[in-house]
Amino acid sequence: MIPGLPAADSAAVLALLKQQQGLEQVVLYGSRAMGRHHSGSDVDLCLLAPSLHLEDLLLLGARLDDLLLPWRFDLQLKHRIDHPGLIEHIERVGVALL
């Protein structure tokens, strides 16, 4: 489950993510992974999906938007992250969701 989201909303997000072809793992990071989130915190997700392209990421983001949930989802493809500090943060505090 995603911390701070109602169980039904969290389940809807995870079910949608499970449908994505080529998705090997989903890691929650940021304030929700560290337990420091508040009601307006976004949901930071790092996707381990080497075969996905930016177009796929945009479509996945649009599908998440179609759920009409009140949170913003920040999606990152791990193989496209070029900021060493962000990768270190994800590896240090990340929580595998899928």
Where are the regions that the model predicts?
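Short beta-strand->loop micro-motif that forms the acidic, two-metal-ion catalytic signature
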Residues: 44-47
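Catalytic core of pol beta-like nucleotidyltransferases
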Residues: 1-25, 34-39, 50-98
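Conserved H-loop
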Residues: 31
